[in-house]
């Protein structure tokens, strides 16, 4: 299966972001990808990061999902879209999964917020396993996979062969960009992604924005913990790669024995 990871720049408006999504979906489909994943809260943008976020309400959310569902259907590509989900309790950071026929498969809200995000968002309270072309996958959003390994293991122990990891690290004005993938002198983010893959024997597809000063790459990490492919830091575009699902056995995830650790 070929997967596509989309690294667009931060959208300057909702319409600009939608055009980026449309173009990248079409390009990924033309290159044979079965699924495409966008960064964390791409529409309308992630609050609290120093960037202006366009106004966004439930009507805007409905407009976005209708448009993206139509493009998924016309391009025949499943899509994981990082969005802001408007609920009665407040705004959530979420990822919406849309099938290649345009039907919504489900939504994964970010359950473990970074402490700095709590003034802007409310957490989700459920987790979901998804499928594309019969392949089970999970979603862990940014801080969840970086700091809470349980969010990835939850999916891996339930059969996920890959966990998609939409995130944002660094920015256009501040950030420490690694010299190379896994750079020991750089922030811990890429090393954490490597651990999530290795400790569960699954693929991790980690998706960042195209930023001037990113602190982690858009990359695919194999079940053995090696970087299969990555985009150059700060480069806008698509990372497309075929993954070997036979390698994603989930062996180490299924060997976890919680009964050996009594409360």
What are these regions (language model features)?
Residues 16-25, 147-153:
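Short, acidic/polar
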Residues 39, 44, 111, 166, ...:
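Conserved residues at the C-terminal ends of beta-strands
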Residues 81-83, 94-97, 128, 218-220, ...:
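Short beta-strand scaffold segments in enzyme catalytic cores
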Residues 14, 22-101, 169-198:
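Cys-nucleophile CN-hydrolase/nitrilase-fold catalytic domain and related Cys-dependent amidase chemistry
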Residues 60-80, 146-236:
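CN hydrolase (nitrilase-like) catalytic-core segments centered on the catalytic cysteine
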Residues 7-14:
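Short polar catalytic/cofactor-binding loops
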Residues 1-4:
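Extreme N-terminal starter segment of soluble prokaryotic enzymes
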Residues 87-186, 191, 247-262:
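Active-site catalytic loop in hydrolytic enzyme cores
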């Amino acid at each position: 299966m070929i997967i596509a990871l989309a690294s667009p720049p931060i959208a300057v408006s909702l319409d600009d972001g939608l055009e980026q999504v449309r173009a990248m979906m079409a390009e990924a489909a033309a290159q044979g990808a079965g699924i495409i994943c966008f960064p964390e809260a791409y529409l309308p943008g992630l609050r609290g990061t120093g960037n202006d976020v366009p106004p966004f309400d439930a009507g805007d959310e409905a407009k976005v999902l209708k448009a993206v569902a139509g493009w998924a259907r016309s391009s025949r590509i499943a899509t994981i879209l990082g969005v802001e989900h408007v609920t009665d309790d407040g705004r959530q950071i979420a990822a919406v999964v849309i099938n290649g026929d345009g039907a919504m498969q489900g939504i994964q809200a970010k359950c473990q917020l970074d402490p700095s995000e709590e003034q802007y968002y409310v957490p989700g309270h459920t987790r979901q396993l998804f499928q594309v072309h019969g392949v089970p996958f999970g979603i862990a959003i940014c801080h969840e996979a970086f700091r809470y390994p349980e969010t990835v293991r939850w999916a891996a122990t339930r059969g996920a062969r890959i966990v998609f990891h939409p995130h944002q690290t660094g920015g256009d004005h501040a950030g420490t960009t690694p010299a190379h993938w896994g750079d020991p002198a750089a922030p811990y983010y890429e090393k954490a992604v490597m651990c999530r893959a290795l400790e569960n024997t699954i693929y991790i597809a980690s998706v960042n924005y195209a930023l001037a000063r990113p602190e982690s790459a858009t990359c695919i990490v194999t079940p053995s913990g090696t970087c299969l492919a990555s985009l150059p830091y700060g480069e806008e575009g698509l990372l497309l790669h075929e993954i070997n699902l036979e390698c994603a056995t989930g062996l180490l995830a299924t060997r976890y024995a919680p009964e050996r650790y009594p409360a």
